[in-house]
Amino acid sequence: MVASVLVGLMSLFSLVAPGETPRPTLDFRLQDHRGAVHTLDEARDQKVVVLAFIGIECPLAESYAPRLADFARDFGKRGVAFYGVDSNQQDGPVAIGRFADKHKLPFPVLKDVGNTLADRLGAERTPEVFVLDASRAVVYRGRIDDQYAIGIHRPSSTKRDLVDALEAVLAGRPVAMPKTETVGCKIGRVTKPVETGAVTYARDVARILQSHCVTCHRPGEIAPFSLTDYRQAAGWSSMIAEVVDEGRMPPWHASPEHGKFANDARLSAVEKKAIRDWVAAGSPEGNPADLPPPPKFVEGWQIPRPDMVLEMPRDIEIPAEGSMPYELVEIDPKLTHDVWVGASQVRPGNPAVVHHVVVFVLPPGVDKIDEEGGDFLAAYAPGMPPRVLPEGVAKRIPAGSKIMLQLHYTPRGTKQIDRSRLGLVFTDPAKVHKELMSGMTLNLRLQIPPGASDYVSRADFRFSQPSLLLSVLPHMHLRGKSMKFVAEYPDGRSEVILDVPRYEFDWQNLYTLDQPKPMPEGTILHTEAHFDNSSENPNNPDPSRVVTFGEQTRDEMHVGYLNFTLADQDLALGAPTSKRLANGQYEVTFQYHPEAPAKSVALVGTFTDWKEHPVAMSGPDAQGNYATTVTLDSGSHEYKFLVDGDSFRHDPGNPEFNGFFHNSLIRLP
């Protein structure tokens, strides 16, 4: 157990500017996670001391821990002593020890109980480093380098601030840049709460966190820390207030000016104010009797027990640092018949490093994801719920299909492995009325010039039949700036379906409309994407190259995924029925029920030269159905129903389609 801490200051100190005489500063007496006491005086024989403030659950501290370990080993040979300092009230000694062991830190990590040392130094965030020269004056404070920041993952650093400061001090030169801005997690300081705050954790804040945060911020999930109890929430309270005020959390990037979404993650103005008031009052706990019941989470699968679980056939290795290209993993489910999927869930094998997963169906004859092949099936991203389709709606996977997983990983400071899984819940085909269909707007001709800061790309999708739009998902890579989905209706109207003005590659959101939106036949869904290939984009892997379409992160994509159903489809009506004749031909019976009363209905298709030789259908009967029977050869036949001589309609009871115009298809062996 960490004992009380004494931090003795010989004098208050300030940062030394170039040319100033360093002033004596401090000594401290702090315990590490093992209970060993350390003082600054123990480094009296060292030329330089580095105090690195870290938080064991801060993602940036995780990213920089291996680098600090390397620096400590390299500069330790030259007379530089490193100390880690953890001032977070929520970080205990056992957890600090696990962090130090995981990252193989060759220096002690000291527990700054009561954040006394952090207060004296003015440390605000983690990771933040302080460099003390031989007289133990602070000659540099700030970031380690510029590779990582909030929403920034450069391939490598362009400024090596800590290294430059150490080299200058060791060479006897003034530090050229004695202070840099630190980004990262706010230190979880101990505060003195107001005795009776108007807003308390127990009565108010716990409910907000349960509704919006703890799905991810709980043990075993993607978030780097938990927010399931008061101690954790209080330790992160100032950081919570910051990310809420800045709109970074909960992650939601749709403009509020357009569209309504069932999975809108935003906090209300009342909820935001409650968090601000709570933090301003010192984060009071309140009466534990006011706490809401703890939320119940399904352990493991969050969908009903899967009928099929597909596991990646191999482990994926994730490096400790840097970035890694997309991984494409193909799985053969060995389907001998069509299956209908009513619910699906991607379960990351290692949630800490799985950035996102997109799952596609590759029907027989399709071996890659492009505008001709690859059907969207499922997705995973932090905070994205499992896909549970409405009653009567299901996704069909044809027999013989393969499953393709597109995975993106984020290194987290240590080497890791992942083997993710996909769970599928099947639906009885007899209960399926509508097939979930997928489409995409796709620009394969991207040619983003070097240095272009606002390259515009456009792509469209045309609804060839009356449809109901359910959800959309914008996808770009590191140069993506924004994407907008606009529906252009046949009557000349246009409507913004989704506007993402600030696209973030770190968050792959599926935007589910609160109600299915009708897309009349002929509606064109336009997507306009903007890209920044300039050096001003900190995530840009290489602003000097022409960027084209490609699956790897260094390349770019302009993809607008969309999920929809056909408005008049009712698979319960059934597909055409057939009977094999003695001569090898088939007698096929077609039925059709028009949406509105019709004067006439005819059967047309490849076997009638379409409108050249239409087959009149008899009807309507008492139920309003039209029917006809024709004789066809074996093979595949496309067809539609011609209503009143000028309106082509697909077969609402047949899930098989073919071609750009989604002609209904019947296969006769």
Go through each PLM region and give its residues.
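A short beta-strand-turn-helix
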Residues: F28-V49, V194-R203
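Aromatic- and Gly/Pro-enriched helix-to-coil junctions and flexible linker segments
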Residues: M177-L335, H356, G400-Q406, P411
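Structural microenvironment flanking redox-active thiols in thiol-disulfide oxidoreductases
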Residues: E62-H103, L110-R120
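Conserved redox-active cysteine motifs that mediate thiol-disulfide chemistry
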Residues: G55-R67, V214-R218
